[in-house]
Structure formats: C-alpha cells, structure tokens
C-alpha cells in the first residue's frame, strides 16, 4: 500500500471529535472465544456501511453486520480489558459518534478512539456553570494527561485543567 494511501486510511478517515452524536441502546451481546459482538440500534443505522468506524463510549469499533435498524461491532479481548465495554449489559446505553472526514467541520478535539486505560472518577465539583472531575488512573502505565490537553471519557472530550502523576 502506498504511504499516501496509509495516511488517508489511518489519519483522515478515523478521526473523532469527542462530541457525542447520539445515545444507543445495547440490543444484544454475544461472546465468541475472547471476542464480544455487541448489537446496537440507533437513528443513523441506515446510514452505516460494513467496515465503517464508529466510536462507542469513545472506543473505535468497526461495523461488521447491519440488519434493519440494528448493527453489530466486535470488541477483541484487549479492547475489553482496557475499556468499560466489557461491563455492558443488554439495555445499557453508550455514547456514539461517527468518524468525521478531514474536510468536515471540526468542533471538538482530535480523538482517535484508541484507549490507554480506564480510570475512576473520585470527585465531581459543581463550579456553577461548569464541572471539575477528578479521575484517578494507574500511573504505572504512564501519565496519560497533559495540562491544557484533552482526555476522552466515555467518548466525551474534556480539557485537562490540573495534570498530576495519577489523576
């Protein structure tokens, strides 16, 4: 594959903004060896194509099946270990965002849909018009935040205010 084609595939076609497009309900969960197939329904299912990327709680997953108003994606074991998708149950809702094209309007941050690890929200402060969340994560896996950078939580891109070694 020519380098220019790789750039198109891996950079331009797989960008998300961290702005949630819609909530989607988990309709079915099917385990196959170490993989899990999730079936969802949402208002834009009719616009999806096989092999299209969609962020589910911020995790880039590929559409593998479309059946009427429902579509299916597959999460591999590593994805299930590093995300909260393995905790989903039928009836739960996830945040969805379709990938944007490079020439589309860019209103959020650059989000790739690759997950480093999960964290735990340890405090939420109401600042009268905005919110401050403290999220603890495993510092042994590396500092995943940069002051004034962004972090994506369940698909929602947020600006980092105070970056510490473990939060």
List each model region and its residues.
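Short, Lys/Arg-enriched N-terminal segments with co-localized hydrophobic residues
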Residues: 1-14
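Conserved loop->alpha-helix
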Residues: 13-167
């Amino acid at each position: 594959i020519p380098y220019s084609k790789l750039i198109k595939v891996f950079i331009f076609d797989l960008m998300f903004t961290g702005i949630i497009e819609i909530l989607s309900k988990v309709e079915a969960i099917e385990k196959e060896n170490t993989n899990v197939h999730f079936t969802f329904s949402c208002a834009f299912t009719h616009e999806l194509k096989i092999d299209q990327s969609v962020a589910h709680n911020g995790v880039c997953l590929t559409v593998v099946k479309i059946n009427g108003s429902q579509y299916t994606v597959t999460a591999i074991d590593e994805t299930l270990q590093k995300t909260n998708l393995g905790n989903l149950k039928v009836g739960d809702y996830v945040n969805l965002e379709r990938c944007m094209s490079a020439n589309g309007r860019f209103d959020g941050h650059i989000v790739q849909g690759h997950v480093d690890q999960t964290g735990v929200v340890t405090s939420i402060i109401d600042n009268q018009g905005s919110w401050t969340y403290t999220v603890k994560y495993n510092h042994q896996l590396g500092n995943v935040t940069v002051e004034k950078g962004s972090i994506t939580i369940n698909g929602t891109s947020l600006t980092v205010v105070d970056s510490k070694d473990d939060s």
